[in-house]
A protein has these predicted regions:
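Asp-based, Mg2+/Mn2+-dependent phosphohydrolase catalytic module
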Residues: 2-8, 13-32, 43-67, 74-258
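Conserved phosphate-coupling serine/threonine residues in phosphotransfer and NTP-handling enzymes
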Residues: 40
Length: 258
């Protein structure tokens, strides 16, 4: 074991407040020797933004330890685009910046890709323009399939829905549980799947992503999925722990003491 990929909401944060054991987990990871990254489907904040949010909750984590679905989406677009690098982006500044930094020009006409994330400025014109461009041949890409985030916040899947209904075309979702997101995170850490653990609270995103990518998986019961939910799934996590407090001894056992 050389590395840990860890979800944020439901593992270390809940409604922007630290969960039990969060500070101890963060401090332990920062001391080493494990490489680690906090992986989130939330596309509307940069790593620096997330680091500030964590700091407000008393968790000191440098920005370089965060990887988002916006970053993975930009990486996916780079690999797919070839010489076609023109995109219409529906999203906040973090996604727009990631796509721009990937070498794309941003436009609302004659584009190669329509990229949808999350934005508080979502409106009729955005829906109409996105649908029009997709119907004219633009490829439909979305950051993540989640319909709702913490506190019932509308997430990417909710923004995608009307565009999908109008066009009759489903997007390619980059974020968890897509294996592309996991491979991007592994590359970010510089490790192989058999050297890394996936820690998360959601069977439908975190755990299935880890299972499909060949990682050891740990379900933390302080978030979305509970032990009683497991009967609904054909797959299982390798480990189940109550919270981050219970995760620490497990990590110490597997690494010979952190």
């Amino acid at each position: 074991m050389k590395a840990v990929i860890c979800d944020i909401d439901g593992v270390v944060l809940q409604d922007n407040r630290p969960l039990p054991g969060a500070k101890e987990l963060v401090d332990t990871l920062r001391r080493g020797p494990l490489r680690f990254v906090f992986l989130t489907n939330y596309p509307s904040q940069t790593p620096a933004d997330i680091a500030n949010r964590m700091a407000d909750a008393g968790l000191d984590i440098p920005a370089e330890h965060f990887y988002t679905s916006a970053m993975a989406t930009a990486e996916f677009l780079k690999k797919q685009a070839g010489h076609k690098k023109k995109a219409f982006v529906v999203g906040e500044g973090a996604l727009v910046h990631a796509v721009y930094e990937a070498g794309f020009s941003l436009s609302d006409s004659d584009v190669d890709f329509v990229v949808v994330g999350e934005t508080r400025a979502y409106n009729f014109e955005m829906i109409q323009r996105a649908a029009h461009l997709i119907n004219r041949g633009a490829r439909f890409i979305a950051t993540n399939a989640d319909v709702a985030g913490p506190q019932g916040r509308p997430s990417c899947g909710a923004f995608v829905a009307p565009i999908e209904r109008i066009t009759g075309k489903a997007p390619f979702y980059v974020g968890k549980p897509n294996a592309f997101m996991m491979r991007a995170a592994l590359a970010f850490l510089g490790v192989h799947s058999d050297e890394c653990w996936m820690v998360g609270d959601n069977m439908d995103t975190d755990i299935i992503a880890g299972v499909q990518s060949g990682l050891v998986t740990v379900l933390v019961l302080s978030g979305v999925s509970q032990e009683a939910d497991l009967t609904r799934y054909a797959y299982r996590p390798d480990y189940i722990v109550k919270d981050a407090v219970a995760l620490l001894p497990l990590l110490e056992e597997r690494t010979g003491g952190l």
